A protein has these predicted regions:
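NAD(P)H dinucleotide-binding glycine-rich loop of Rossmann-like/cofactor-binding domains
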Residues: 88-163
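Short glycine-centered segments of the SAM/dcSAM-binding site in methyltransferase folds
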Residues: 79, 159, 254-255, 282
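Residues in the short beta-alpha loop(s) of Rossmann-like NAD(P)-binding domains
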Residues: 189-192, 262, 289
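C-terminal hydrophobic helical "lid"/dimerization subdomain
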Residues: 1-3, 171, 217-221, 229, ...
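Mid-domain Rossmann-like dinucleotide-binding core that forms the NAD(H)/NADP(H) cofactor-binding site
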Residues: 131-216, 221
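Glycine-rich cofactor phosphate-binding loops and adjacent beta1-alpha1 units
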Residues: 152, 197, 201-281, 345-346
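Glycine-rich beta-strand-centered segment in the early N-terminal region that forms part
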Residues: 20-36, 46-92, 124, 129-131
């Protein structure tokens, strides 16, 4: 079967390609994609990556059309979200219970999730009901927020500073509150602009106690006005350039969790290692691979403990995608999460 999907590179150079999905194997499923969210990684590819065209999209939901002969967990007609990278269940780490360390990962084999159809090992499919396909497309980034806050080991009633007010930063801030953080600050940029005000407003709606404009003030100084000893946990969802500021915000014996990425040389930053050593700061890298916590994320979206309407601000089709990505990167529209409908019904 043929599918049509999106591939992109710098600067917002998007190609719509037709490609062959191949035969449906005994463990595979064919999904008609109904909604696919635009991730910060996709935006990074479109802004910074000049090495090749990258398959776009990994935050997707859809309907099962066909299954292989050995598939038992889903059936045609089921609504599903897709774990973009799933644990194999067979390697030593998986069998010893260290699923998060699996390196024999099951994925989409280089196919874009921003596509009409998606073929994948059915092991990656998680059924859902009770929410729209668009809301369900938030499952993957919300699961990243759950992973980040779990890996950060936030103390009950503790203080958290989140760098970044994009979708992942906002999910992290909300999850930190749900995990019992007593104080959450969100650091971003763009105060006084529609783009920044939209995101800071969302942060406050999701429970943030303080929002900080990172370009206009010393972030650590602002944090220490409220938390003289620094924050218990600092979580970086913004580009790596802010990691030194994140360390400055952290208390003695605290933890800095880093999941923000960048490309094109922007991933290399200077860091005062002595400050980390003498202050006994734990710096931890976090990546939500393999995907975990999808069922928890679905439950949070269904209950509206995490409200999908706060996040999805814009909808696009294949025809409007490229221009809208330019608008987002140039902050011409106050977007938080853009959702692609590759098979629009209207």
């Amino acid at each position: 079967m043929k599918a049509v999907g999106l591939f992109g590179r710098k600067y917002v150079n998007v190609e719509r390609r037709e490609y062959d999905l191949g035969e449906i194997g005994p463990n595979d499923a064919l999904v008609e994609v109904k909604a696919s969210g635009v991730c910060g990684t996709d935006l990074n590819f479109l802004r910074d990556s000049d090495d090749c065209f990258h398959p776009l999209g990994h935050e997707l939901s859809g309907e099962v059309l066909e299954i292989g002969s050995c598939v038992r967990n889903v059936k045609p007609g089921d609504k599903v979200v897709i774990e973009d990278v799933a644990a194999c269940g067979c390697c030593r780490d998986c069998q010893e219970g260290n699923i998060s360390l699996c390196r024999s990962l099951i994925d989409g084999e280089g196919r874009p999730g921003m596509a009409t159809h998606y073929k994948v090992n059915a092991h990656c499919l998680v059924p859902f009901d009770g929410i729209s396909f668009e809301a369900a497309s938030l499952t993957e980034p919300l699961a990243v927020g759950i992973t980040a806050t779990q890996e950060s080991d936030i103390p009950f009633g503790g203080s958290v500073v989140v760098f970044g007010h994009g979708p992942i930063g906002l999910f992290v801030a909300r999850c930190a509150k749900l995990r019992g953080a007593g104080f959450v600050a969100v650091v971003g940029m763009g105060t006084g602009t529609p783009f920044g005000d939209k995101r800071f407003g969302a942060a406050r709606a999701l429970g943030a106690d303080l929002t900080i404009e990172g370009r206009k003030v010393g972030v650590a100084d602002e944090v220490r006005k409220v938390l003289p000893n620094g924050a218990d946990r600092v979580i970086v969802t913004a580009p790596p350039v802010v990691v030194p500021d994140a360390v400055n915000c952290c208390r003695f014996g605290g933890r800095v969790s880093v999941l923000g990425l960048s490309f094109g040389g922007h991933e290399v930053v200077p860091l005062n290692v002595n400050q980390i050593v003498f202050n006994k700061i734990d710096v931890k890298g976090v990546i939500a691979e393999p995907a975990m916590h999808f069922r928890q994320a679905i439950d949070l979206l269904k209950s509206k403990a995490v409200d999908p309407d706060v996040f999805i601000t814009d909808y696009v089709t294949f025809d409007t995608f490229e221009q809208r990505m330019r608008d987002v990167l140039e902050q011409k529209i106050p977007a938080i999460k853009v959702c692609l409908r590759p098979n629009p019904t209207e």
